[in-house]
Amino acid sequence: MQITFLGTSSMVPTKERNQIAVFLSYGPEGILFDCGEGTQRQFKIAGISLTKVTKILISHWHGDHVLGLPGLIQTLSSMDYNGKLEIYGPTGTKKRMEKMFEAFVFDKRINLDVKEVKSGILFENNDFQLEAYPLEHGIEILGYRFVEKDKRKIDMKKIKKFNIPDGPLIGKLQRNKSIEHDGKKIMPDEVTYTEDGKKIAYITDTVLCDNCHKIAEDADLLICEATYSSKLVGKSEEYGHMTAKQAAQVANKSNAKQLVLIHFSARYKNTQELEEDARNIF
Protein backbone atom coordinates (compact mmCIF):
# COMPACT_ATOMS: atom_id res chain seq x y z
CA MET A 1 0.00 0.00 0.00
CA GLN A 2 1.29 3.44 -0.94
CA ILE A 3 -0.36 6.85 -0.59
CA THR A 4 0.74 9.82 -2.72
CA PHE A 5 -0.47 13.35 -2.03
CA LEU A 6 -0.77 14.88 -5.49
CA GLY A 7 -2.46 18.06 -4.33
CA THR A 8 -3.23 19.64 -0.97
CA SER A 9 -4.51 23.12 -1.83
CA SER A 10 -8.12 24.24 -1.57
CA MET A 11 -9.98 26.30 -4.18
CA VAL A 12 -6.96 28.25 -5.43
CA PRO A 13 -3.71 26.40 -6.28
CA THR A 14 -0.40 27.97 -5.33
CA LYS A 15 3.13 27.68 -6.70
CA GLU A 16 3.80 25.06 -4.05
CA ARG A 17 0.47 23.24 -3.87
CA ASN A 18 -1.79 21.74 -6.52
CA GLN A 19 -5.55 21.41 -6.16
CA ILE A 20 -6.73 18.43 -4.18
CA ALA A 21 -5.96 14.85 -5.21
CA VAL A 22 -4.78 11.84 -3.19
CA PHE A 23 -3.75 8.52 -4.77
CA LEU A 24 -3.89 5.18 -2.95
CA SER A 25 -2.05 2.32 -4.64
CA TYR A 26 -3.01 -1.14 -3.38
CA GLY A 27 -1.96 -4.17 -5.39
CA PRO A 28 -3.58 -3.92 -8.83
CA GLU A 29 -5.93 -1.17 -7.64
CA GLY A 30 -5.23 2.54 -7.95
CA ILE A 31 -7.77 4.65 -6.08
CA LEU A 32 -7.81 8.40 -6.71
CA PHE A 33 -9.60 10.54 -4.14
CA ASP A 34 -10.75 13.67 -6.00
CA CYS A 35 -9.16 15.05 -9.14
CA GLY A 36 -8.40 18.75 -8.94
CA GLU A 37 -7.03 20.82 -11.80
CA GLY A 38 -3.54 19.70 -12.85
CA THR A 39 -3.78 16.24 -11.31
CA GLN A 40 -2.47 14.40 -14.37
CA ARG A 41 0.67 16.57 -14.34
CA GLN A 42 1.16 15.71 -10.68
CA PHE A 43 1.08 12.03 -11.61
CA LYS A 44 3.96 12.65 -14.01
CA ILE A 45 5.95 14.54 -11.38
CA ALA A 46 5.35 11.69 -8.91
CA GLY A 47 6.47 9.12 -11.50
CA ILE A 48 3.14 7.28 -11.48
CA SER A 49 1.51 6.18 -14.74
CA LEU A 50 -2.06 7.37 -15.24
CA THR A 51 -2.93 3.84 -16.33
CA LYS A 52 -2.54 2.77 -12.68
CA VAL A 53 -5.82 4.55 -11.88
CA THR A 54 -8.71 2.08 -11.61
CA LYS A 55 -11.16 4.00 -9.42
CA ILE A 56 -11.89 7.69 -8.86
CA LEU A 57 -13.83 8.69 -5.74
CA ILE A 58 -15.33 12.16 -6.09
CA SER A 59 -16.22 13.87 -2.83
CA HIS A 60 -18.37 16.56 -4.49
CA TRP A 61 -18.62 18.63 -7.65
CA HIS A 62 -17.01 21.91 -6.65
CA GLY A 63 -14.48 22.70 -9.38
CA ASP A 64 -11.34 22.39 -7.29
CA HIS A 65 -12.15 18.70 -6.76
CA VAL A 66 -13.03 17.71 -10.33
CA LEU A 67 -11.46 20.13 -12.83
CA GLY A 68 -8.73 17.58 -13.56
CA LEU A 69 -11.20 14.92 -14.71
CA PRO A 70 -11.60 15.91 -18.40
CA GLY A 71 -7.86 16.10 -18.99
CA LEU A 72 -7.14 12.88 -17.15
CA ILE A 73 -9.79 10.97 -19.10
CA GLN A 74 -8.66 12.46 -22.41
CA THR A 75 -5.05 11.45 -21.75
CA LEU A 76 -6.09 7.93 -20.76
CA SER A 77 -7.98 7.61 -24.05
CA SER A 78 -4.82 8.55 -25.96
CA MET A 79 -2.83 5.94 -24.04
CA ASP A 80 -5.06 3.05 -25.16
CA TYR A 81 -6.28 2.52 -21.61
CA ASN A 82 -7.71 -1.00 -21.74
CA GLY A 83 -9.24 -1.21 -18.30
CA LYS A 84 -12.59 -0.08 -16.98
CA LEU A 85 -12.35 3.18 -15.06
CA GLU A 86 -14.84 3.23 -12.19
CA ILE A 87 -16.00 6.66 -11.05
CA TYR A 88 -17.96 7.00 -7.81
CA GLY A 89 -19.59 10.16 -6.56
CA PRO A 90 -22.64 11.66 -4.86
CA THR A 91 -26.11 11.96 -6.35
CA GLY A 92 -25.94 13.88 -9.62
CA THR A 93 -22.58 12.47 -10.69
CA LYS A 94 -23.94 10.61 -13.72
CA LYS A 95 -25.65 13.71 -15.09
CA ARG A 96 -22.57 15.86 -14.52
CA MET A 97 -20.36 13.32 -16.29
CA GLU A 98 -22.75 13.33 -19.24
CA LYS A 99 -22.61 17.14 -19.36
CA MET A 100 -18.82 16.98 -19.28
CA PHE A 101 -18.75 14.75 -22.35
CA GLU A 102 -21.14 17.14 -24.08
CA ALA A 103 -18.91 20.11 -23.30
CA PHE A 104 -15.63 18.62 -24.52
CA VAL A 105 -14.72 16.82 -27.75
CA PHE A 106 -13.09 13.47 -26.99
CA ASP A 107 -11.61 11.75 -30.04
CA LYS A 108 -11.82 8.42 -28.27
CA ARG A 109 -13.82 7.18 -25.30
CA ILE A 110 -12.54 4.82 -22.64
CA ASN A 111 -14.65 2.26 -20.80
CA LEU A 112 -16.27 4.13 -17.91
CA ASP A 113 -18.53 2.85 -15.14
CA VAL A 114 -20.08 5.79 -13.29
CA LYS A 115 -21.87 5.02 -10.03
CA GLU A 116 -23.74 7.29 -7.64
CA VAL A 117 -23.32 6.62 -3.94
CA LYS A 118 -25.47 7.57 -0.97
CA SER A 119 -24.17 5.82 2.15
CA GLY A 120 -22.48 2.58 3.15
CA ILE A 121 -20.30 0.07 1.31
CA LEU A 122 -19.81 1.02 -2.35
CA PHE A 123 -17.26 -1.65 -3.31
CA GLU A 124 -15.98 -4.88 -1.77
CA ASN A 125 -13.69 -7.72 -2.79
CA ASN A 126 -11.60 -10.30 -0.92
CA ASP A 127 -8.95 -7.75 0.04
CA PHE A 128 -10.73 -4.52 0.98
CA GLN A 129 -13.93 -2.53 0.96
CA LEU A 130 -14.73 1.10 0.23
CA GLU A 131 -17.34 3.00 2.21
CA ALA A 132 -18.91 6.43 1.75
CA TYR A 133 -20.88 8.63 4.15
CA PRO A 134 -22.51 12.04 3.63
CA LEU A 135 -20.83 15.16 4.99
CA GLU A 136 -22.12 18.74 5.32
CA HIS A 137 -21.03 21.39 2.82
CA GLY A 138 -24.27 22.81 1.44
CA ILE A 139 -24.26 20.43 -1.56
CA GLU A 140 -24.20 16.66 -2.04
CA ILE A 141 -20.86 15.53 -0.63
CA LEU A 142 -19.24 12.32 0.59
CA GLY A 143 -16.35 11.31 2.79
CA TYR A 144 -14.67 7.99 2.05
CA ARG A 145 -13.20 5.11 4.01
CA PHE A 146 -10.85 2.37 2.77
CA VAL A 147 -10.96 -0.75 4.96
CA GLU A 148 -8.48 -3.54 4.33
CA LYS A 149 -9.64 -7.03 5.30
CA ASP A 150 -7.83 -8.75 8.15
CA LYS A 151 -5.22 -11.22 6.92
CA ARG A 152 -4.17 -14.57 8.29
CA LYS A 153 -0.37 -14.74 8.47
CA ILE A 154 1.89 -17.74 8.91
CA ASP A 155 4.07 -17.92 12.02
CA MET A 156 7.23 -19.40 10.49
CA LYS A 157 8.70 -20.41 13.86
CA LYS A 158 5.65 -22.55 14.58
CA ILE A 159 5.68 -23.94 11.04
CA LYS A 160 9.26 -25.13 11.59
CA LYS A 161 8.27 -26.66 14.91
CA PHE A 162 5.75 -28.88 13.10
CA ASN A 163 8.19 -29.50 10.19
CA ILE A 164 5.59 -28.40 7.66
CA PRO A 165 7.22 -28.01 4.21
CA ASP A 166 6.65 -25.09 1.87
CA GLY A 167 3.77 -25.72 -0.48
CA PRO A 168 0.03 -26.33 -0.55
CA LEU A 169 -0.25 -27.30 3.13
CA ILE A 170 0.86 -23.83 4.22
CA GLY A 171 -1.51 -22.26 1.73
CA LYS A 172 -4.36 -24.28 3.17
CA LEU A 173 -3.56 -23.12 6.71
CA GLN A 174 -3.45 -19.53 5.48
CA ARG A 175 -6.96 -20.02 4.10
CA ASN A 176 -8.02 -20.94 7.64
CA LYS A 177 -8.31 -24.68 6.97
CA SER A 178 -6.89 -27.53 9.06
CA ILE A 179 -4.34 -29.98 7.63
CA GLU A 180 -3.02 -33.49 8.30
CA HIS A 181 0.78 -33.78 8.55
CA ASP A 182 2.92 -36.61 9.95
CA GLY A 183 -0.20 -38.24 11.34
CA LYS A 184 -1.26 -35.12 13.23
CA LYS A 185 -4.16 -32.78 12.64
CA ILE A 186 -2.95 -29.19 12.74
CA MET A 187 -5.44 -26.36 13.19
CA PRO A 188 -4.86 -22.92 11.63
CA ASP A 189 -4.78 -21.20 15.03
CA GLU A 190 -1.79 -23.33 16.03
CA VAL A 191 0.53 -21.90 13.38
CA THR A 192 -1.05 -18.63 12.20
CA TYR A 193 -2.04 -15.24 13.54
CA THR A 194 -4.39 -12.51 12.35
CA GLU A 195 -2.97 -9.22 11.11
CA ASP A 196 -5.46 -6.38 11.33
CA GLY A 197 -6.23 -4.65 8.05
CA LYS A 198 -5.40 -0.99 7.59
CA LYS A 199 -8.07 1.72 7.60
CA ILE A 200 -7.69 4.95 5.63
CA ALA A 201 -10.18 7.81 6.06
CA TYR A 202 -10.65 10.74 3.67
CA ILE A 203 -12.60 13.80 4.81
CA THR A 204 -12.73 17.12 3.00
CA ASP A 205 -14.97 20.17 2.56
CA THR A 206 -17.30 19.82 5.52
CA VAL A 207 -18.19 21.38 8.82
CA LEU A 208 -17.66 19.23 11.88
CA CYS A 209 -20.43 16.59 11.91
CA ASP A 210 -21.17 13.11 13.28
CA ASN A 211 -20.16 11.33 10.08
CA CYS A 212 -16.66 12.79 10.36
CA HIS A 213 -16.18 10.54 13.37
CA LYS A 214 -17.84 7.58 11.67
CA ILE A 215 -15.48 7.83 8.70
CA ALA A 216 -12.41 8.35 10.88
CA GLU A 217 -13.18 5.66 13.48
CA ASP A 218 -10.02 3.68 14.36
CA ALA A 219 -8.31 4.89 11.19
CA ASP A 220 -4.64 4.04 10.80
CA LEU A 221 -4.45 7.21 8.72
CA LEU A 222 -6.93 10.07 8.73
CA ILE A 223 -6.59 12.43 5.77
CA CYS A 224 -8.60 15.47 6.76
CA GLU A 225 -9.17 18.97 5.52
CA ALA A 226 -7.71 21.91 7.45
CA THR A 227 -8.71 24.85 5.30
CA TYR A 228 -8.20 27.44 8.05
CA SER A 229 -6.45 27.90 11.36
CA SER A 230 -8.50 28.17 14.54
CA LYS A 231 -8.19 31.98 14.34
CA LEU A 232 -10.62 31.85 11.40
CA VAL A 233 -13.17 29.43 12.83
CA GLY A 234 -16.00 31.84 11.96
CA LYS A 235 -14.97 31.97 8.30
CA SER A 236 -14.52 28.21 8.34
CA GLU A 237 -18.11 27.66 9.46
CA GLU A 238 -19.43 30.29 7.03
CA TYR A 239 -17.92 28.50 4.04
CA GLY A 240 -18.57 24.94 5.23
CA HIS A 241 -15.04 23.95 6.16
CA MET A 242 -13.02 22.72 9.12
CA THR A 243 -10.04 24.18 10.93
CA ALA A 244 -6.83 22.30 11.66
CA LYS A 245 -7.85 22.21 15.32
CA GLN A 246 -11.17 20.58 14.43
CA ALA A 247 -9.40 18.01 12.26
CA ALA A 248 -7.22 17.11 15.24
CA GLN A 249 -10.30 16.86 17.46
CA VAL A 250 -11.83 14.39 15.01
CA ALA A 251 -8.60 12.36 15.04
CA ASN A 252 -8.58 12.27 18.84
CA LYS A 253 -12.23 11.39 19.31
CA SER A 254 -12.13 8.75 16.57
CA ASN A 255 -9.00 7.03 17.88
CA ALA A 256 -7.08 7.65 14.65
CA LYS A 257 -3.41 6.68 14.75
CA GLN A 258 -2.08 9.27 12.31
CA LEU A 259 -3.41 12.53 10.90
CA VAL A 260 -2.45 14.20 7.62
CA LEU A 261 -3.87 17.66 6.98
CA ILE A 262 -4.94 18.71 3.47
CA HIS A 263 -7.00 21.33 1.60
CA PHE A 264 -5.16 24.42 2.80
CA SER A 265 -6.37 27.91 1.96
CA ALA A 266 -4.03 29.75 -0.42
CA ARG A 267 -3.64 32.44 2.26
CA TYR A 268 -1.15 30.16 4.03
CA LYS A 269 2.27 30.32 2.37
CA ASN A 270 3.42 27.53 4.68
CA THR A 271 1.52 25.21 6.95
CA GLN A 272 3.28 25.95 10.25
CA GLU A 273 0.30 27.72 11.84
CA LEU A 274 -2.03 24.90 10.84
CA GLU A 275 0.37 22.23 12.08
CA GLU A 276 0.71 23.97 15.44
CA ASP A 277 -3.07 24.16 15.76
CA ALA A 278 -3.36 20.42 15.20
CA ARG A 279 -0.35 19.42 17.33
CA ASN A 280 -1.82 21.23 20.33
CA ILE A 281 -4.68 18.73 20.21
CA PHE A 282 -3.33 15.56 18.56
Language-model features and meaning:
Residues 38-88, 113-118:
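Active-site metal-binding motif and surrounding structural segment of the metallo-beta-lactamase
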Residues 81-85, 90-116, 267:
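Active-site neighborhood of divalent metal-dependent phosphoester bond hydrolases
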Residues 1-46, 82-84, 144-146, 192-203, ...:
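Conserved beta-strand hairpin/beta-sheet module of binuclear metal-dependent hydrolase folds
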Residues 33-36, 53-61, 89-90, 201-206, ...:
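Active-site neighborhood of phospho(di)ester-bond hydrolases with catalytic His/Asp-centered motifs
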Residues 119, 209-282:
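Binuclear metal-ion centers of metallo-dependent hydrolases, dominated by the metallo-beta-lactamase
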Residues 6, 117-124:
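Local beta-strand/beta-hairpin segments that build beta-sheet-rich folds
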Residues 14-16, 126-202, 206-215, 221-223:
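Active-site-proximal loop/helix segment associated with metal-binding centers of metalloenzymes
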Residues 68-75, 100, 269-278:
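Metal-dependent catalytic neighborhoods of phosphoester/phosphodiester hydrolases
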